[in-house]
């Protein structure tokens, strides 16, 4: 697939063998986040492996996780950045959340960055779809105590226009400053659950 990047399975298995290992799974936002998150996590003794693909909807991320799990290469901790490409068919999102949670199992911790899409051309429709996805993730988190939401969407919604533009210039993809903020929020959420 165009833009699909991932560690080979042996490298994933090495990270999976470390109790503090983390898998970054997601879409083009995950690809942007990757360097900042890897360095942030590694500073705190969390080695990271990855599988991301520009334009990937959550069903394809779930497919990738099933394959990683089948290869016994799934770490104890997952960071998921997915949903931005589900705004066109939000009704399909809950099934994919459940596939990911079932594949991860109850012993792993899943940190899902809440998606926010707010493109200049369609701000109202994008915001409505993003809000639906957020509600679906929030509902899933009430049923899965090991699903932790990283409140990226809330942070961007609460920001003033200048801050929002500096963190997410196109309404979807974080800037270099934005990825640092997102990486820090992910680490804070992981740390708050004592991993």
Task: Give the location of each predicted region.
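Conserved beta-strand termini and adjacent loop/short-helix elements that scaffold enzyme active sites
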Residues: 51-53, 113, 150-155
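A short helix->loop->beta-strand "cap" motif at the edges of active sites that frequently abuts
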Residues: 105-109
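Catalytic His-Asp segment of secreted/periplasmic serine-dependent ester chemistry enzymes
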Residues: 121-195
